[in-house]
């Protein structure tokens, strides 16, 4: 399965980033903590390679806590600044400004020496539905940026004043134009970063079950009370349908409904704290 999705507004945003880069002091690269590597857009990062960046692993409350620490160390080992946050609850959000100020302390000090006040300008970048607008709302304590739980809700860019020293630019999320790696595509579909009409939910649900059935078997068993050990992914999905009453009129199991239910449970953390990516060992 290959998801091909790159709407016109996404292409426009990419061009605008190139134009805006000369005005931006620092970028917040928002990643989904459940898939920190899969939710990176390294094609985008090439465009802004000359600017400081903070990798913000959002939705860390839904991700495996142990792996949150592992990924934070992974970025640090690669000389990249990373912080795990929960933008909804505000966990660690305040630390972002402190980190930004530290990264740009030389520019700030230089401005002070000249008798000026340095305005630090951010751009928030990330794939759809990673929580860009929610983060901005939490930082600014307002709802100036539209928020939603569907990928691509935020469209128009806007400058938002945080305080006398910080301004943030919210830009539309950008997804890799062609997801050639099926595993990456499945993970992004599973966490809700791709519109559901663009992929086969049953296919994604079964593949995702296959990804997590060993490491998180205890969570699956606790949620659905099903012993996975003797079942295939398809059989497991059918059993979920039976348990949850996903029955069609003719008595068959509605596997599409079961798949939808499973993916919803995964995204909302009802199964438990799960991370789909693995730290790359170097």
Question: Which positions does each model-derived feature cover?
Answer:
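Alpha-helical scaffold segments in soluble metabolic enzymes
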Residues: 95, 99, 134, 207, ...
């Amino acid at each position: 399965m290959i998801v091909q999705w790159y709407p016109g507004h996404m292409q426009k945003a990419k061009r605008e980033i190139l134009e805006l880069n000369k005005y931006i002091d620092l970028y917040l690269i928002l990643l989904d903590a459940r898939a920190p590597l899969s939710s990176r857009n390294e094609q985008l990062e090439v465009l802004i390679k000359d600017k400081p960046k903070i990798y913000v692993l959002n939705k860390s409350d839904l991700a495996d806590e142990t792996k949150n620490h592992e990924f934070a160390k992974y970025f640090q080992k690669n000389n990249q600044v990373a912080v795990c946050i929960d933008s909804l609850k505000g966990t660690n959000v305040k630390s972002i400004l402190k980190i930004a100020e530290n990264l740009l302390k030389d520019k700030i000090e230089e401005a002070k020496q000249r008798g000026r006040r340095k305005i630090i300008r951010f751009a928030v970048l990330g794939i759809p539905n990673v929580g860009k607008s929610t983060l901005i709302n939490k930082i600014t304590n307002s709802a100036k940026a539209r928020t939603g739980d569907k990928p691509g809700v935020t469209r128009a860019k806007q400058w938002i004043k945080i305080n006398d020293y910080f301004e943030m630019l919210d830009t539309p999320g950008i997804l890799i134009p062609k997801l050639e790696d099926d595993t990456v595509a499945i993970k992004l579909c599973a966490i809700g970063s791709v519109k559901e009409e663009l992929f086969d939910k049953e296919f994604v649900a079964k593949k995702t079950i296959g990804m997590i059935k060993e490491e998180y078997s205890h969570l699956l068993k606790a949620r659905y009370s099903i012993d996975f050990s003797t079942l295939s992914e398809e059989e497991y999905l059918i059993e979920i349908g039976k348990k949850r009453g996903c029955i069609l009129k003719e008595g068959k199991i509605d596997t599409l409904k079961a798949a939808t239910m499973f993916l919803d449970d995964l995204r909302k953390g009802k199964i438990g704290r799960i991370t789909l990516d693995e730290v790359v060992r170097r």
